[in-house]
């Protein structure tokens, strides 16, 4: 499993998956064969998260090879990420509340040995420990393993889902505020109220080809509860028409300017905005910070090849950019 840090790598991985492995995706996608065999899934999410390739681009490529009826499950899975982003976009207080809760819970659990054992992969559950190791070493987990992991974290290890979501965001190359936060809420039973996801021994054994033993889980836990409800807000957009003398700000989740809506628009200058780890609300692993930095550098290189004046700046420097600037939407920072 190789996550190159360029748009060229993303396109290469997309083409390889569609040409060689997409035809069996629906049948094999739930199997986790381990980090050395990911041929049954696309592994494109790190690039989609950073906007290096788009969901639409991926879907169009898949439909160039197979009909919708043969391709429907893959398209559904791609669009889940789009759905979650839209859902959270309309309910931003879910993210704000999560961060506020996380701040309090961090303090409460900073000396908790159960929590330390979990993030160090030192529990009495073999598969969980292996997933912790895999997450730290590869910055990726199979989607099915993420569901099992979250369920074990919440219902067997009895740890707050907020800390688990933070642990994923710290390490995952495809860590996305929407998919990650709402996915953990869904497992806990508060995203779809009263319906939680419970990992089971038979399911883990079946879909890992019996790679693990010693899987003793709480398989009868009730869902977590929350008295908070969130109403969708109304979004309004006002795209200016004359942008020629304006600057454009591009953030780390939109790193494919050349396929975006403004690709033919001339800007005075484009600023690619990075974010130092010490300024993030969720601190990222060094490997993840490097991954993001290299993707930003690749976007800069591609823009400069088109003779577009481009500069990488830190998030804290935005205030120094003159007021005739616009940000490429959506903006996302943790």
Where is each model-derived feature located?
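C-terminal catalytic domain of photolyase/cryptochrome flavoproteins
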Residues: 1-143, 151-314, 318-321
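Short, solvent-exposed turn/loop segments enriched in Gly/Ser/Thr/Pro and often Arg
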Residues: 147
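Short glycine-rich phosphate-binding loop at a beta-alpha junction
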Residues: 324-328
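Conserved small/polar residues in nucleotide/adenosyl-binding loops
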Residues: 333-334
